[in-house]
Swiss-Prot record:
Its main location: cytoplasm. This is Large ribosomal subunit protein uL6. The modification N6-acetyllysine is found at residue 121. Component of the large ribosomal subunit. The ribosome is a large ribonucleoprotein complex responsible for the synthesis of proteins in the cell. GO terms for molecular function: rRNA binding; structural constituent of ribosome. It is found in: Cytoplasm. SUPFAM superfamilies: Ribosomal protein L6. One of its GO terms (cellular component) is cytosol.
Length: 192
């Protein structure tokens, strides 16, 4: 069964400006600019109102799979708005039983070097995605802080660090060493 029209709107805050170029969404805010291309999805994007403070996503004559993309695009745009206003911060903790993992940040926070993982001499180097800065926490021991405006790039960088410390040829129920995401949040606190 096909639904004639499915639509959803996203409210745009005062300090955020959104421009549409076809199906490319550009979000401008206090922390910077994000752009995302939705050309691969067949939907209509439009800005509503005189001040253009609402974004509407329309899908005509869609089946279940196609209708799901409407909410998906809205969620992506909401994440972009949150990114340019508050920013995203992921915290990661080093876990080790015996050999202390030594993490060094190089090149202004764009390269992470992991040494002494399970006592290995090999140095693991993980390059951060563009727009993601990594730093060692001053308040907490063995903690990394990843910050950026794009949630996909921040979470992807965290995944690259976690995957760099996978334990090979051992029972992973016993060898729990690695660097794992401990907390997900925003750089600035939202005013409730």
């Amino acid at each position: 069964m096909k639904t004639i029209l499915s639509n959803q709107t996203v409210d745009i805050p005062e300090n955020v400006e959104i421009t549409l170029k076809g199906r490319t969404v550009i979000v401008k805010g206090p922390r910077g600019t994000l752009r995302r291309d939705f050309n691969h999805i067949n939907v209509e994007l439009s800005l509503l109102g005189k001040k253009k403070k609402r974004l509407r996503v329309d899908k005509w004559w869609g089946n279940r799979k196609e209708l799901a993309t409407v909410r998906t695009i809205c969620s992506h745009v909401q994440n972009m708005i949150k990114g340019v206003t508050l920013g995203f911060r992921y915290k990661m903790r080093s876990v080790y039983a015996h050999f202390p993992i030594n993490v060094v940040i190089q090149e202004n926070g764009s390269l992470v070097e992991i040494r002494n993982f399970l006592g290995e001499k090999y140095i693991r180097r993980v390059r951060m995605r563009t727009g993601v800065a990594c730093s060692v926490s001053q308040a907490q021991k063995d903690e990394l802080i990843l910050e950026g405006n794009d949630i996909e790039l921040v979470s992807n960088s965290a995944a690259l660090i976690q995957q760099a410390t996978t334990v090979k040829n051992k029972d992973i129920r016993k060898f729990l060493d690695g660097i794992y995401v401990s907390e997900k949040g925003t750089v600035q606190q939202a005013d409730e």
